[in-house]
Amino acid sequence: IESVASEEQKQKYLPKLCSGEYAAGGFCLTESGAGSDPSGMKTKAVLEGDEWVINGAKQFITSAEYAGVFVLWAVTDPDAKRGKGISCFLVEAGTPGLIISPAEKKMGQHASATNEVVFDNCRIPKDSLMGSLNQGFKVAVSELAGGRIGIGSLSLGIGLAAIDYAREYVNEREQFGQKIANFQGIQWMLADAYTD
């Protein structure tokens, strides 16, 4: 929103996001058949009069059930080359036709809900287009680059915390009359965890 939204859109959404009025925002790019290759998305937005009509589904959307607004990418020119003809939109939570599925049951990161977001004849105002028509894929790619830095930092932090917990555990747990930290096999495992 900060990068490409109009001034009106920024004034409408940024204060709500920054103040906590909106607990989160949703980044709706990934689809079940277009994850690693989001340019192959199928979600469509068709202009009908002064409204965009959106149909499709987005998968693995972080904090969707808490989002006040969604940044959505959809195909607006199906005849364009791959990666072209995709536009970016702002869709408010509670818009009729916007359906948030129950949270996925994940192996980890339970404090961060992940949901499917379905758009079933979801109608949004024409001025919900963010940035230029058919130029939204460039926006998505540039935003993903910054997000990867955050994911890398998060992953490193989780890994280091896991090693800290493991080190604490092996120094407390005893077997055969000694701390398991004294066993060479355990030491190898911790060394591998540190170096990997």
What role is predicted for each listed range?
Residues 1-8, 35-37, 46:
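N-terminal glycine-rich flavin-associated loop
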Residues 6, 27, 45, 54-56, ...:
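Buried hydrophobic positions in well-ordered alpha/beta secondary-structure cores of metabolic enzymes
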Residues 13, 41, 57-59, 101-105:
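Short beta-alpha junctions and helix-cap segments that line functional grooves
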Residues 88, 98-196:
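Glycine-rich beta->alpha junctions and the first turn(s) of the following alpha-helix
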Residues 17, 34-41, 47-48, 52, ...:
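Hydrophobic, small-residue-rich alpha-helical packing segments that form membrane-like cores
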Residues 33-36, 60-63, 79-80, 106-113:
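Short Gly/Pro-enriched turn/cap motifs at secondary-structure boundaries
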Residues 55-100:
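A short core secondary-structure module
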Residues 20-29:
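A short, Trp-centered hydrophobic/proline-enriched beta-strand micro-motif
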